[in-house]
C-alpha cells in the first residue's frame, strides 16, 4: 500500500529539468510520439462543430424558439401515438378482426 502511495506522489510531481511526461507503457525499443498534449490544446477551441446548434444557442442564452419547436414536436408525437392506440382499441372492440383470431395477445392502451 505504501508503494502505491509513493508512486502516486511521483506521478503528481510537476515537470522538472524541462523533461516531458512520457505516455505509460513505453519500454525498450519504444520511441515517443512527441508532445501530443500540445496538439490537443490546439484542437480544443474548435469543439463547437460537434455540438448541435440547439445546444449552442441554449448555452449562449438563446431566445427559446428552439425549445418552443421541440415542445411542439413532442405534442405532435403524443397526438399521433394516442391516435394509433385509439385506432387499435376501436378495431379490437368493433370486431374487425376475424373470428378465428385469438384476442388474448392483443392489448389496448386507453388514453
UniProtKB/Swiss-Prot annotation:
Which residues does Zn(2+) bind?
Answer: 108
Where are the residues of the annotated region Interaction with 14-3-3 epsilon?
Answer: 68-111
Biological-process GO terms, alphabetical: extrinsic apoptotic signaling pathway via death domain receptors; negative regulation of protein ubiquitination; signal transduction
Alphabetized UniProt keyword annotations: Apoptosis, Cytoplasm, Metal-binding, Nucleus, Ubl conjugation, Zinc
Q: Where is this region: Disordered?
A: 1-63
How is the protein altered post-translationally, as described in the entry? Ubiquitinated. Degraded by the proteasome.
Highest taxon above the source species = Eukaryota
Sequence motif Nuclear export signal, location on chain = 77-87
Chain intervals for the UniProt region annotation (Interaction with p75NTR/NGFR): 68-93
- State if Ribonucleoprotein is listed as a keyword: no
Q: Which InterPro entries match?
A: BEX (IPR007623), TF_A-like/BEX (IPR021156)
Question: Can you list the GO cellular component terms from the UniProt entry?
Answer: cytoplasm; cytosol; nucleus
Primary location class:
nucleus
Note down the stretches annotated as region His cluster: 100-104
The listed locations are: Nucleus; Cytoplasm, Cytosol
Organs and tissues of expression: Found in ovarian granulosa cells, testis, prostate and seminal vesicle tissue. High levels also detected in liver.
Molecular function (GO) terms listed?
cysteine-type endopeptidase activator activity involved in apoptotic process; identical protein binding; metal ion binding; molecular function inhibitor activity; nerve growth factor receptor binding; signaling receptor binding
Question: Which Pfam family name is an example for this entry?
Answer: BEX
Q: Which family does it belong to?
A: Belongs to the BEX family.
What is the protein's known function? May be a signaling adapter molecule involved in NGFR/p75NTR-mediated apoptosis induced by NGF. Plays a role in zinc-triggered neuronal death. In absence of reductive stress, acts as a pseudosubstrate for the CRL2(FEM1B) complex: associates with FEM1B via zinc, thereby preventing association between FEM1B and its substrates.
Q: How does it assemble?
A: Self-associates. Binds to the DEATH domain of p75NTR/NGFR. Interacts with 14-3-3 epsilon (YWHAE). Interacts with DIABLO/SMAC.
Q: What does the UniProt entry state concerning the protein's domains?
A: The nuclear export signal is required for export from the nucleus and the interactions with itself and NGFR/p75NTR.
Record-given protein name: Protein BEX3
What would be the name of the gene that encodes this protein?
BEX3
Amino acid at each position: 500500500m505504501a508503494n502505491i502511495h509513493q508512486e502516486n506522489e511521483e506521478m503528481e510531481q510537476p515537470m522538472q529539468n524541462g523533461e516531458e511526461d512520457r505516455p505509460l507503457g513505453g519500454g525498450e525499443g519504444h520511441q515517443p510520439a512527441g508532445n501530443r498534449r500540445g496538439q490537443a490544446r490546439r484542437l480544443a477551441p474548435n469543439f463547437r462543430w460537434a455540438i448541435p446548434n440547439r445546444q449552442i444557442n441554449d448555452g449562449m442564452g438563446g431566445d427559446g424558439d428552439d425549445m418552443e419547436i421541440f415542445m411542439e414536436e413532442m405534442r405532435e408525437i403524443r397526438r399521433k401515438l394516442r391516435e394509433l392506440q385509439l385506432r387499435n382499441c376501436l378495431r379490437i372492440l368493433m370486431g374487425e378482426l376475424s373470428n378465428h383470431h385469438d384476442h388474448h395477445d392483443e392489448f389496448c392502451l386507453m388514453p
